[in-house]
Amino acid sequence: MTDNVTFTLRPLPKAAFVAGYAGLLPQVIAAAMVLSGMEYRWTGLAAAYGYAAFIFSFLGGMWWGLAVTTRNNDTAANGIFALAVAPSLLSLVTYLPWIWGWEWPGPSLAWLGIFLMLSPLGDRWLSSRCALPLGWMKLRWRLSIGLGGTTLFLAAFA
C-alpha cells in the first residue's frame, strides 16, 4: 500500500526565526569568553567547538527528518539519507585531533566553520528532492553564515 501525501508549503513561523537567531547566542557568548583574555579562554574555545559540532550534527538530523517525511520518491531519498549522516561524520573527524593529541581546536574550528557556511548548499540540493517550508533557505543562509562565520573567527584565536 502506498500513501500519497501532499504537502502544502507554508511559510516558516516567526518563532522559527526567533529561535534560530537565539541559537547564535551560545557561540557569541563563547566568543566573548575567548576575547576576554581571562582564564575562560580555553573553556570558550572548547564550548565553541562543541556547540558548532552539535549544531552541524543537528542539521543532519533535520535533513534526515525531511527525507523521511517529505521526499518526492524513495529513489530521491537515498541520496538525502547519505547527505544527512555527513554532518555527524564530519564532526567526528574534526574531534579526532583532540583525541590523538594533535593541534586542536584551531583547525577543527576552522573546518567546522567552513562546513557550516557551506551547508545551505546541501539544502539547495535537498530542495529538488523534498518539500522545504517557504523561507527555509533565507533562514538557513543567515544562520549558517552567522554560526559558521563566528566559528571561523574563533579559529583564528585558538
Kindly label every feature range from the protein language model:
Residues 23-30, 81-92, 139-154:
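Small-residue-rich segments of transmembrane alpha-helices in multi-pass membrane proteins
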Residues 42-58:
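Loop-to-helix transition at the N-terminal end of transmembrane alpha-helices
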